Amino acid sequence: MRQAETARKTNETNISLTLEIDGEGKADIQTDVPFMTHMLDLFTKHGHFNLTVDAKGDTDVDDHHTTEDIGIVLGQMFKEALGDKKGIKRYGSSFVPMDETLAQVVVDLSNRPHLEMRAAFPSQKVGTFDTELVHEFLWKFALEARINLHVIVHYGTNTHHMIEAIFKAMARALDEATTIDPRVKGIPSTKGML
């Protein structure tokens, strides 16, 4: 089974996380950042992962450390759960519409971390959540999972819709990229390693 779990405690956050890549979309997400809880819940559902997260942090300061550290831990567990990556499709892409918004996410599980993001959010906040933290979360996730992640919001006017479409598209792209393809023998690279 492709799964991983960890607990990470710092002076700023305390996070426990379990991930099953080949799941059923079951989520048990408990964080001090309600908007991230919502995004992780739908990420799990649309990626067909099983994910549990218990994250507490210094949200009396702001949501930055908790959001960033969830991205770090989720990325680390994604990398660990994927193991040697034998037989995976490696690449995945998805377009997701949400009302007036269209988001696109493309991933390569290449072991070369990079985030390219094109999204101009009209609002600086969704509720109490600072929208600049979306980039922070995605970058830390890509860095720790060691994936190449491209995120484009082609258009949209509602910031909540734009971010939600990103998380859904990322989930669907990762679901595709992590799928075992019976035609792929070994590592999906001419170098023989990822």
Swiss-Prot record:
State if Amino-acid biosynthesis is listed as a keyword.
Answer: yes
The terms describing its cellular component in GO are:
cytoplasm
Return the Gene3D superfamilies for the record.
Answer: Imidazole glycerol phosphate dehydratase, domain 1
Q: What is its EC number?
A: 4.2.1.19
Record's keyword terms, sorted: Amino-acid biosynthesis, Cytoplasm, Histidine biosynthesis, Lyase
Q: Where in the cell is it found?
A: Cytoplasm
Enumerate the CDD domains for this protein. IGPD
SUPFAM superfamilies attached here? Ribosomal protein S5 domain 2-like (SSF54211)
Q: What class of enzyme is it?
A: lyase
- Supply one GO molecular-function term: imidazoleglycerol-phosphate dehydratase activity
In terms of InterPro entries, this protein maps to: IGPD_sf, ImidazoleglycerolP_deHydtase, ImidazoleglycerP_deHydtase_CS, Ribosomal_Su5_D2-typ_SF
Query: Which reaction does this chain catalyze?
Result: D-erythro-1-(imidazol-4-yl)glycerol 3-phosphate = 3-(imidazol-4-yl)-2-oxopropyl phosphate + H2O
Question: Which biological process annotations from GO are given for this protein?
Answer: L-histidine biosynthetic process
Pathway(s) it belongs to: Amino-acid biosynthesis; L-histidine biosynthesis; L-histidine from 5-phospho-alpha-D-ribose 1-diphosphate: step 6/9
As for family, the record states:
Belongs to the imidazoleglycerol-phosphate dehydratase family.
What is this protein called in UniProt?
Imidazoleglycerol-phosphate dehydratase
Report the source organism: Bacillus pumilus (strain SAFR-032)
